[in-house]
Every structure is written in C-alpha cells, then in structure tokens.
C-alpha cells in the first residue's frame, strides 16, 4: 500500500481534507432547489462507498510497504471490523443530523455550531485517549480554527436576507450532530495499528482497510437512519424511495 512519508505532503493532504470537509455542504445547498436532503444523502453515502472502493484498490493495493487491501481484509479480526463499522454508523447519524440542520437553519448556523463542537470535543477525546503531538500547538490550532469557523458563521449570518429566523430545531440538531461526530474517530482508530503502518499488528487493519469498513458502516446504517428520516422528516412532507429512483 502507499504510505505518506513526506511531512509536506501530509500537510497538503490535510488541507485538501479541510477543503472537502468544508465544501460538501455547498453541494447539498445547490441540490436543495429540486432534491430533498434526505434523497441527496443517499448520493452522499454511495459516493463515500465508491470512493473507498477506488482508494483500496489503488493506493491501498499498490506499493511495497504494509499489507495490500485484499491480504489485509482477510486477516482483520471481527472486533476491529465491528469497531470501524460502529465508527461509520456514529458518523452517519451525526452527519444526517447536520444535513437536516443545514436544510432547516442554513449553513451559517449548522456548520459553525455542529462542526465546531465536533472539532473541539473530538480533539479532547482523541488526544486524551491517545496523546500524540505537541499539545500546545495542537490546542492552539484548534482555538484558531474554531475562531475561524465562528467568524465565518457570523459573516454568513450577516449576509442573509433581513427577517430570516434561525430555527431552534436546527440549532438543537446541529449541537447533537457535533457531539455525536466527536466520538466516531476513536472507534475507527481502534481498528488500526497507528504506531506501525509498514508492519501493522496481525489482526488489525491498515488505514485503507479501516476506511473501507468505515464506509460500509456509513452505507449500511443509512438504510436505518435515513429511512427513518425519510418517513419522519424534521421538516416538510415524507419522501419515498420511488422519488429517489424517478429523480
């Protein structure tokens, strides 16, 4: 599998991740004119699964380091598979709530509150469960990012049309989403040997395999979580699978 050994490249990948994490909500808003978020969310989860498949059969299978995907997936123990699946289910539940909040209260409210809570709580939870890195720079960075998110929310809020009221329901959903999202990574991390990517502990997953199992957890849990939201939406009338397939 391919392993990032360059610090500079790792930072670049982090920036790409941040851009993607902060941009997917825009696609939801663009689609919302004629595509309910409950239906959009199926596209979102299917996209994650397809990307995971592409990743494990390319970067996760090429190279001389570590275990290739097909070799690795066969030896992962059931407990670690379950852990990554649980992480996917938790992430999916939180993201559905965040999407609902975006559709109700708008991105200016949902993202600063939901993602901000997830970021702050997630750093504390994951750092104290597995302390790595310089805490000063880590928590300084967190504070700066949170300030940036808050400023972005304020700026976006001022840009809204006069008279727009943020729904209390949307704020509550964003807060619950943020709290849930802060817990998902520890379950995914528990499935991996984070100390040795080149020769991972037998029975544990490589990052590529863990991400693939995580994506399966998202997709499978969507049949429960999103079906419930489709039948009992937070706002608007129920939607059906027929509407999804007819477009």
Predicted region positions:
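Polytopic alpha-helical membrane proteins, predominantly small-molecule transporters/carriers
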Residues: 1-247
